[in-house]
Amino acid sequence: MKNIRNFCIIAHIDHGKSTLADRLLEFTKTIQVTEGQMLDDMDLEKERGITIKSHAIQMEYEYGGEKYVLNLIDTPGHVDFSYEVSRSIAACEGALLIVDASQGVQAQTISNLYMALEHDLEIIPVLNKCDMASAMPDEVEDEIIDLLGCKHEDIIRASGKTGMGVEEILKAVVERIPHPTGDEEAPLQALIFDSVFNSFRGIIAYFKIENGVIRKGDKVKFFNTGKEYDADEIGVLKMDMIPRAELRTGDVGYIISGIKTSREVKVGDTITHIARPCEKAIAGFEEVKPMVFAGVYPIEAEDYENLRASLEKLQLNDASLTFQPESSLALGFGFRCGFLGLLHMEIVQERLDREFDMNVITTVPNVSYMVYDKQGHANEVHNPGGMPDPTLIDHIEEPFIDATIITATDYIGPIMTLCLGKRGELVRQNYVSGNRVEIHYKMPLGEIVIDFYDKLKSISKGYASFDYHQSGFRPSKLVKLDILLNGEPVDALSTLTHVDNAYNLGKRMCEKLKELIPRQQFDIAIQAAIGAKIISRETIKAVRKDVTAKCYGGDVSRKRKLLEKQKRGKKRMKQIGNVEVPQKAFLAVLKLD
């Protein structure tokens, strides 16, 4: 146990952690020199250059005449996946804090760092990409020292591209990170920090043993779900899974026990023996709650069952995705899906498209609201269609977040304007270094769901970084905004919005739909309504034939008769005609500026 070191890598998106991890693996001869990131398996991970799932890999390293086992647990850096990060951090004793020498400290770096400090991890700061022409190692070192309170000589300068500093990192891991502590005699207690789905073997859980020993064939149970299994195969994770007869305290490994559904394996759960269970679970387990909800509908109605099967398969690998069936008058049958955030939603959509060849329509994303009726009962509503009658509602509460934005001082003005427009309240701001500032806001989650991140990036020329945590619910004046076409509500376009924004949003939606819905043989009235009150209207004029073209001179009553006849025909057509809303209209309404 003395020769085991468990560590993870903390970094903001795109600060080069996966590339640096490759260099560590090559240096310890765990892998041959290869192309591309070893730890990012999914094509999507490689393409977007982000790490979505956590991964683990074991390296062997000789130092001072002794052999050490180093377990690297890779973590995602993106805000949507922060729960996966927290579980990975809990399985470690130390962390490499990687900061890009050309970009400096970013918002996600700080939030993940605080998480690591809460778990009392030993932090080794690493300055990456020092070989770049745009690197400013001295300035960024000062930022790290302000943040961590460490010394200059504690910071290792490295480059994932050239391999500089890799040996120093490995030495620091052995010297500075403490070995795992635990009692091999105690009952088994192991923390699950990830699970993957394998189509032949079922769900494979990755765990780290805190106390005790696990042997092949043991009967084990998972603490929070209470389910019992046989440990058919256990082992360690190198580039492939290597079976072992037993794993001891401090080891990181995997267990295969023929589990079929991902719901049974919850990240953060505790594994223990049935015969001799541990007293209590490892602290810090929480159910991951989806934050953003959207309707997902197949474009062809007959693909409904295929969509269900595809979502179920995705859920095997991605336990944070939730879905339940719902139907819409405009779009037919589909599912209400819950996601961790917007990036997660985009990734699920792309994976449906790529891995299952499913084309889907997604409705306006929204968050879940707490609706209190006059009797004081609370209902959680994920869908504007599920809102009770306004006369029965006492008040509505919506989820708020604590947002942290780090940006260059030049962009403070426009960013503050953006946050105020999204009903943000400034909590505080402080300067990280001479020209970078950290701004804290309290904001409603519903406002940032649609396009906040994109706007923030474009205002700040891509330099601002953003991170958020949920901070509970607050009462809000929310109303349900309906869009009517010729007096018929289109349920897929309904949204919940704040009273102050309702008029503006309704007007913009009507104008946008007017551009996108094709003209018909009759007038189409597009209206935005709150309850029975119409707040905005646009009319798409009918296409009409010039029926009086054949009249030369003659009496005006002849023309009038023809025009009246046309009018009657249009009126009859309007009663039986219906308006098709094209798919691009649904998408454009999502991206209103």
Swiss-Prot record:
Annotated Pfam families: EFG_C (PF00679), GTP_EFTU (PF00009), GTP_EFTU_D2 (PF03144), LepA_C (PF06421)
Annotated catalysed reactions: GTP + H2O = GDP + phosphate + H(+)
Annotated tr-type G domain residues: 2-181
Keyword vocabulary terms for this entry: Cell inner membrane, Cell membrane, GTP-binding, Hydrolase, Membrane, Nucleotide-binding, Protein biosynthesis
Hydrolase is among the record's keywords: yes
InterPro entries registered for this protein in UniProt: EF-4 (IPR006297), EFG_III/V (IPR035647), EFG_V-like (IPR000640), EFTu-like_2 (IPR004161), LepA_C_sf (IPR038363), LepA_CTD (IPR013842), LepA_IV (IPR035654), P-loop_NTPase (IPR027417)
Annotated Gene Ontology cellular component terms: plasma membrane
Highest taxon of the lineage: Bacteria
Record-linked PROSITE patterns: G_TR_2
Enzyme Commission designation: 3.6.5.n1
Annotated localization: Cell inner membrane
MF terms (GO), sorted A to Z: GTP binding; GTPase activity; ribosome binding; translation elongation factor activity
GO biological process terms held by the UniProt record: positive regulation of translation
Membrane topology type: Peripheral membrane protein
Residues binding GTP: D14, H15, G16, K17, S18, T19, N128, K129, C130, D131
Similarity remark: Belongs to the TRAFAC class translation factor GTPase superfamily. Classic translation factor GTPase family. LepA subfamily.
Function: Required for accurate and efficient protein synthesis under certain stress conditions. May act as a fidelity factor of the translation reaction, by catalyzing a one-codon backward translocation of tRNAs on improperly translocated ribosomes. Back-translocation proceeds from a post-translocation (POST) complex to a pre-translocation (PRE) complex, thus giving elongation factor G a second chance to translocate the tRNAs correctly. Binds to ribosomes in a GTP-dependent manner.
HAMAP family referenced in this protein's UniProt entry, alphabetically: LepA
Protein name: Elongation factor 4
Originating species: Phocaeicola vulgatus (strain ATCC 8482 / DSM 1447 / JCM 5826 / CCUG 4940 / NBRC 14291 / NCTC 11154)
Organism placement in taxonomy: Bacteria, Pseudomonadati, Bacteroidota, Bacteroidia, Bacteroidales
